[in-house]
Each structure stands twice: as C-alpha cells, then as structure tokens.
Amino acid sequence: MKLNDRHMKRILLIAFALMVAVAASAKNYKWDTEILYKGAPDAYTEKMCRLDVAYEEGGQDRPVIVWFHGGGLTGGWRHIPDALRRDGAIVVGVGYRFVTNVSLAETIDDAAASVAWVFQNIEKYGGDLSKIYLAGHSAGGYLVSMIGLNKAYLAKYGIDPDKQIKALAPYSGQVITHFAQREKQGIANLTPTIDEFAPLFYVRGDAAPMLVISGDREVELFGRYEENAYFVRMLRLNGHKNVTFYEVDGFDHGDMAEPAHLLLLKYIKNQK
C-alpha cells in the first residue's frame, strides 16, 4: 500500500499527538538495562550481546516488541525508540556483534539468542508469550527477516518462529544478501546476490505474519523499495496469506522509521 500525501499528513498529525502521548506514557515505564543475553567467551561478546527492557510495572499479558537497531551490521547501538514506549507494550532493545568482528552467521545467531532470552524471561515483566513481535530498521530489519524465515537460527534455541512469533516487522530491510556480507566477499555494493544470507532465499507460505514497510521508492536506499516489493510478491506467490506492505511517501531510508513505528503500533492494536 502506497501512503500518499493525504495519508502522510494524517500520519504526521498522529505523530504529533503521539509525541505528546509518549511524553506522558513514557513516565510510567521502568527500565532494566545492560542484560547479558548470551554466554560471553570474550570481552567483545560481553560488551555487545546485551539488551534493555522498557516496561510498565504491574502489567500483565502485554505485547512484546523485540527491537533490532540499524547500522549496516557494522555500527549503531542498541536503543528503544521512544515512539514504541506506549500503550503498555514491552519493548526490548537488542545489541549484537558486528560483521567487522565476527561472521555474519554469528551476528544472526546473536539476534536469535536475544529472542530466546525474551521467551525465557519476559513473563516476569508482564509480557505475553503469544504476543511477541520482532521488529527492526535497516540492518535490524534484515536480522528480523533472517531469523524469522530461516528457521534453523531459532530452532537452535527450541523456538519455531512460524508458531511462536506473532509477527515479523522489518522496516526497510535488505532482503538480498546483505551488502556488508557482499563487501566481505569482494562483491560490489550494487551487484545483487541471493544466497544463504538472503531472506529472499527462504520465502515460503507458512512463515509468521509479516508487516513489511519501505520508505519512498524515489528516495530509498539502493532500490530498497523494489527489493521489498519483490520480497512481498514472492512471499505471496509462495502462498503466504498474511503479508501487509506499506510504502511511506516522502520518507527516505533514514527517517522512514518514525512513521513505521505508528504503523507497527496500529498493526499490533488490530491483532486478535
């Protein structure tokens, strides 16, 4: 669905109202930070494989958003978007190791390990294990799609993403082989490949529900809209019946996350 100027004006008005609401709602949130979610055999793992939890004290049966930051798999830092701290949702901000220091498979495994931690611990914060959403922007969106579609990553931790994840919500994520991996292989940035490190390699009809969001096709990064449009088409051709796709007009790769947060919250609110 392409969100035109009229839709975007409405979203921006909602965004302004949301900022006011978040300021009030965020005051009710408690924080648990610097939680090590994975065994730390070295100082780098101990530094990077940590997560933060934002939650409302006393809540029960709350939806849980596991959030993966962007940064090209080579940078960025874990955080919890202010816009997601509302309506009682529990938000988990995940850090992970970068491909400059470890293999891409290890980075993806970090993402899977963090989700395993959530399943093992989030109930004590009031989270509902049947309402766990995986979301992320850019590189974070890529990680969401990889662990949601290549079942081997979460199966290692006893989790079936098709049955146990409420929905996958990648924002402007790479769906071909990630450019950071292609760079390590000596492949040019604008030369696309699809291999075992491409979410497209794993498209299937029985995956978890998906909310796929892209920025404006005219200002997105490296044809990212077209990548995601093809991704959605291939999911549907493979029989997936629960894929929602948005393009947000006027927003580039960097700033599309703000309206995407609103779309995710609305999506969660509409789930049964």
Task: Annotate each predicted stretch with a short phrase.
Residues 16-25:
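Hydrophobic h-region of N-terminal signal peptides that target proteins for export
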Residues 27-59:
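N-terminal cap/lid segment of alpha/beta-hydrolase-fold proteins
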Residues 61-70:
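Short beta-strand element of the alpha/beta-hydrolase
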Residues 77-94:
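Short amphipathic alpha-helix adjacent to the substrate-entry channel of hydrolases
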Residues 103-123:
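Alpha/beta-hydrolase active-site loop
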Residues 119-183:
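Primarily recognizes the serine-hydrolase "nucleophile elbow" in alpha/beta-hydrolase
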Residues 159-162, 167, 173-179, 191-229:
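The feature captures the conserved acid-bearing segment of alpha/beta-hydrolase catalytic domains
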Residues 213, 229, 236-272:
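C-terminal catalytic histidine-bearing segment of alpha/beta-hydrolase fold enzymes
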